[in-house]
Amino acid sequence: AKTAAGITAGAAVVKTARADVYKSILPSSVLGANEMIRTGHIGVGVMGRGNLLNNMKRPDVMPIAVCDLHPRMLAEKHAMAQSKNPDATAHEDYMEVIENKDVDAVICSTTDHWHAMVTIAACDAGKAVYCEKPLSTTVKEGQAMVAAAKRNNTVVQCGTIQRSGQQFQEAIELVKSGVLGQVGHVHTFALNMLAPSGIGNPPDITDPEKWGKFGPWEKYQGWVEHKPFNVNRWLNHFRWFFDYAGGKLTDWGVHLVDIAMWAMGEDKLPKSVSASGGKFIMTDNRTTPDTLNVSWEFDNYLMTYTNRVWTSYADHAMDPDDHGIIFYGTKGTLKLSRKGYKLIPTDNQEFDPEAKQWKKFESAEAKEAMGDGMLYEKHLENFVSCIRSGEKPISHIESCHRSSAVCHIGNAAYLAGAKLTWDGAKEQFVGGPDDAVKQANEWIARPYLNGYTLG
């Protein structure tokens, strides 16, 4: 069986990766404050490029290996890594990176359906791991990833970068402080204008000689059902296909849901979920919906998510924006995004942070935001610090599993077409139409095909 053999845009099929295989290469101790952290980058596409560049900016981090299945991507990022470290190596097989005893931390920026295999193998090899969001493509994968991190006592930071943003941290403290009163509804939304052609309709290609320049397509597909080559199923657009990802909900939605749940209490889990939507506007070949509304019911609040890929205008009473989180409370409302946050009081008041109370106001001014670039830098700083200290990162793997799983069950409810009862402790659906419950539970624990096994 093929186990922990992830590819992405980067890596190849290898034998089972178990902890006992790596006893001879495990790091002997937590890295000291002055030691260089040596990184291996697996998957160096769009997100992988950004993560590589951010690592290269730090004087205490050295890229020593890059890995990708796409020949052009690999060559470009190898040259980039060599601009800082001439001895950096290039690989198609990601296990060569993980088995390299000189690699301290693995940066996993693969397509979503390879996150689990890469992360589990890296944890079992004793490496620190930075894994892009979403953590997984199924709830079952997330469970296995959390288990691998725990059994190896591994530092794992996930790519939910908003946790490192000052405006998000401040806004969360405001919500937790009670100044909004009782929050009964948290709305999240992610919008963009791509109508109607979107990602386009490139043809499937069945002749390997014609698609071979992109790399080993069969290896890239790995454990999922194999399909004819289509350029949209690789490269930048993989996330719009349910084979490899979860659409906008697991792409942008996981960022928003993560912050919403952090503010409302991470120990609180939804008890039911429903979703509606479809592919109504777009004429491209995506398989994920272009319009989606999801509703999760918690014991004492409702969380909702809206996605439309055919309009960038948010139809709410606050500043128009293309993404955000809105906390609706009995004493006020807080709107939060990467652009900043704004408190909108009831009864024409504003919040005085020094007095920690509402007061009359003439106009409400927004708190300015920390830019995206700073979010990534602060997030990496936290990861590096935790590698040295052994402390739990701000986007620790348990938190990202929770937020990713909540998104997965939203997609499951959409595909099953029913409102479903969720048991957060068991992480399975326990109520709803029998056929829908069965379909949804199968979706969140999809089996590995083509000879692959998980963990």
Segments predicted by a language model, with ranges:
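N-terminal Rossmann-fold NAD(P) dinucleotide-binding loop
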Residues: 48-49, 115
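NAD(P)-binding Rossmann-fold cofactor-contacting core
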Residues: 61-81
